[in-house]
């Protein structure tokens, strides 16, 4: 699963790879976002399309509709999200992109778990496919968004882990288009997924395990 990631650069660093200024309805903000330890249950900047323009909204990371009596879900599997009763409406009408610098995976080493930071080897930001309950701008505290995870056995540090479905910038832009059908979105997810050999990773401090910890040192090699 994808349960922690870094979103630290400026909005422009991410947006520049996705769309021209004319396609966006997003105020310019030169300040880095500065989040090196983004955790579920917090509001995260999420990119989506409305009225043919891209919008950036702070959206709750987690999804728990009124009838759901368990902790909020944070991931949706790419193999089943498009057809499952719970996620199909979100797949069809609530596609979005969560941009990031990389994400964290933990691997058991002896009796402890070692965290690793995973990122694109070419240094580009990553664009994680997401689905959620629209309209995103309403700021719902329960029905937010989920990160779509890639097919089983595509983990990197741990082959059995499920990594986020990372799309190329071109595929990410298409994924968000409102006129794209659910079936077409499935095709984009399959053809636009960044392959495993495009990623690098290194071990990082176990301090990232505490959601209260922030700072650039959390993504530095140890």
Curated annotation (Swiss-Prot):
Effect in UniProt of substituting residue 162 to A: Abolished binding to single-stranded DNA
Result when mutating residue 40 to G: Reduced binding to single-stranded DNA
UniProt modified residues of type Thiazolidine linkage to a ring-opened DNA abasic site: 2
Swiss-Prot/TrEMBL domain comment: The N-terminal catalytic Cys-2 residue forms a thiazolidine linkage to a ring-opened DNA abasic site. Glu-105 catalyzes reversal of the thiazolidine linkage; self-reversal is favoured by duplex DNA formation. Glu-105 is also involved in sensing abasic sites in single-stranded DNA (ssDNA). His-160 stabilizes the abasic sites by forming a hydrogen bond with the O4' hydroxyl group.
Spans traversing the lipid bilayer: none
Primary role: Sensor of abasic sites in single-stranded DNA (ssDNA) required to preserve genome integrity by promoting error-free repair of abasic sites. Recognizes and binds abasic sites in ssDNA at replication forks and chemically modifies the lesion by forming a covalent cross-link with DNA: forms a stable thiazolidine linkage between a ring-opened abasic site and the alpha-amino and sulfhydryl substituents of its N-terminal catalytic cysteine residue.
Consequence of changing residue 77 to A: Abolished binding to single-stranded DNA
UniProt name for this protein: Abasic site processing protein YedK
Keyword Plastid applies: no
């Amino acid at each position: 699963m994808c349960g922690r990631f870094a979103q630290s650069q400026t909005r422009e660093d991410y947006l520049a790879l996705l769309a021209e200024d004319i396609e966006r309805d997003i105020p310019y903000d030169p300040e880095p976002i500065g989040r090196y330890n983004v955790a579920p249950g917090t509001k995260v900047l999420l990119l989506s399309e409305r009225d043919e323009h891209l919008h950036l909204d702070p959206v709750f990371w987690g999804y728990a509709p009124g009838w759901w009596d368990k902790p909020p879900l944070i991931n949706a599997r790419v193999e089943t999200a498009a057809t499952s009763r719970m996620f199909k409406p979100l797949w069809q009408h609530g596609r979005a992109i969560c941009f990031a610098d990389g994400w964290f995976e933990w691997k058991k080493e002896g009796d402890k778990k070692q965290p690793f930071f995973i990122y694109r080897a070419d240094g580009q930001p990553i664009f994680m496919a997401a689905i959620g309950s629209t309209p995103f701008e309403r700021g719902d505290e329960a029905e937010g968004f989920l990160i779509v995870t890639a097919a089983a056995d595509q983990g990197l540090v741990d082959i059995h882990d499920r990594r986020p479905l990372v799309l190329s910038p071109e595929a990410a832009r298409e994924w968000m288009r409102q006129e794209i059908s659910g079936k077409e979105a499935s095709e984009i997810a399959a053809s636009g997924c960044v392959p495993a050999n495009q990623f690098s990773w290194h071990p990082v401090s176990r301090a990232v395990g505490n959601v209260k910890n922030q700072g650039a040192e959390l993504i530095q090699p140890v």
